[in-house]
Amino acid sequence: MSTSSRALAAYRNALRATKVAFGEDVRMLVAARKAMRHGMLAPDASLPVEDQITHMNDIATFLRRNLVQGKKVSGKDDVYQLRIHEETELGDNATIKETKTTLASQGGGCCGGGKDLYK
């Protein structure tokens, strides 16, 4: 497959991902597609074409799996309905229970109050 056809396939993949991610939110759908179109018409010359194609496919994957939109429920304060679709990646949050290894967590955080929090 030639480079131009792979670039076009990546662009179409990203356009389909915007439809999945933004659904009926026309304002965000149009803005995302406009940004992608601008990136295709004026690509970053500092990146090789192969990296640009990979980046576009990575964007499409991110939009499909990680982006969730919320819509405020009318008549209820601070209540939002999340639009989780079949391609949304749902994690089990198992890593939250693991002991932190950052310098801040070892020293107890910024104020020292969480010294024994993760033990």
Curated annotation (Swiss-Prot):
Q: Where is the transit peptide?
A: 1-15
Per the UniProt entry, the disulfide pairs are none
What GO annotations for molecular function exist for this entry? protein folding chaperone
Cellular component per GO, a single term = mitochondrial matrix
Q: Which domain of life is it from?
A: Eukaryota
| Biological process terms in GO annotation | mitochondrial respiratory chain complex III assembly
List the signal peptide residues. Answer: none
Localization of this protein: Mitochondrion matrix
UniProt keyword Secreted, yes or no: no
Keywords assigned by UniProt, alphabetized = Chaperone, Mitochondrion, Transit peptide
Q: Which family does it belong to?
A: Belongs to the complex I LYR family. MZM1 subfamily.
- Share what the entry says about its subunit structure, partners included: Interacts with RIP1.
What this chain does, per the record? Assembly factor required for Rieske Fe-S protein RIP1 incorporation into the cytochrome b-c1 (CIII) complex. Functions as a chaperone, binding to this subunit within the mitochondrial matrix and stabilizing it prior to its translocation and insertion into the late CIII dimeric intermediate within the mitochondrial inner membrane. Modulates the mitochondrial matrix zinc pool.
What name does UniProt use for this protein? Mitochondrial zinc maintenance protein 1, mitochondrial
High-level lineage: Eukaryota, Fungi, Dikarya, Ascomycota, Saccharomycotina
Gene name linked to the record? MZM1
